[in-house]
Design a protein with these regions (language model features):
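ABC ATPase nucleotide-binding domains
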Residues: 227-257
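ABC family nucleotide-binding domain
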Residues: 2-215
Length: 257
């Protein structure tokens, strides 16, 4: 489904280039739920943007369904994103001049053969699924951060994506709404077979995944199978990375005590 082959990405700093992603290799299978964890600045969000074709690597290849993203034109990438990819941005990226329901509908408006009525009916159902149907005529500036996040999540589902990338999807939500969102993501993954890749600081979210990738200083330092937990109770913790020990060896020692 998705393959990284020796992928490297750097950005120009004031005095020198900053290596953000360093020779990363990994593969994600169709229908897999993968969580990417690591401290701030470790390259997680950059990795996610590369995987979605929002940016191109300096070196290496990224293959989606066997197709190299670097070899596609901007138009081809746009068509790929509108037909196969969903993305939940950490900063929402809602269009300020469109209402909530119009923001949700946008991807289908530019790429679907559905009628306008069908598109808005589908958009309305998605708003209902994230408990935002009462805000459909509101503009982004009239919404709280958590409400904007839920609108962005509804938008990411509109094209029934084959693969969904989510950058901190629960970061701006309380525990109740975080649980709702993660249940929706899990349903997309398990019931519809969509591949799900989530960047998160919250180990409660990460442990829902089939597999956890850990990044540090731009490098993929560990890949391990998650000991999956059930969705409930959803215990949202902003300090989960700092307070949790991610080393499998140390975790096994703690169990033996």
């Amino acid at each position: 489904m998705l393959t990284f082959q020796s992928v490297h990405k750097s950005f120009k700093g004031s005095n020198e280039s900053i290596n953000v992603v360093k020779n990363v290799d990994f593969k994600v299978d169709q229908g897999e739920f993968v969580a990417i964890i690591g401290p701030s600045g470790s390259g997680k969000s950059t990795l996610l943007g590369l995987a979605a074709g929002l940016d191109k690597p300096d070196n290496g290849q990224i293959l989606l369904d066997g197709v190299s993203l670097s070899e596609l034109s901007e138009d081809q990438l746009a068509n790929l994103r509108s037909s196969k990819i969903g993305f939940i941005f950490q900063n929402f990226q809602l269009l300020p001049n469109l209402t909530a329901i119009e923001n949700v509908a946008v991807p289908l408006m530019v790429s679907s053969s559905l009628s306008e009525k069908e598109i808005y009916n589908k958009s309305r159902e998605l708003l209902k699924s994230v408990h935002m149907e009462h805000r459909e005529k509101h503009f982004p500036l009239q919404l709280s951060g958590g409400e904007e996040q839920r609108i962005a999540i509804a938008r990411s589902f509109i094209n029934d994506p084959k693969i969904l990338f989510a950058d901190e999807p629960t970061a701006n939500l309380d525990s109740k709404n975080g649980e709702i969102v993660m249940q929706l993501l899990q349903d997309l993954n398990k019931k519809k077979g969509s591949t799900l890749i989530v960047v998160t600081h919250d180990l409660t979210v990460a442990r829902l995944a089939d597999r956890i990738l850990e990044m540090k200083d731009g490098e993929l330092i560990e890949s391990k199978t998650s000991k999956k937990q059930s969705m409930k109770p959803y215990n949202k913790s902003a300090k989960s990375i700092k307070k949790s020990n991610l080393s499998p060896k140390k975790r096994s020692k703690s169990k033996s005590k």
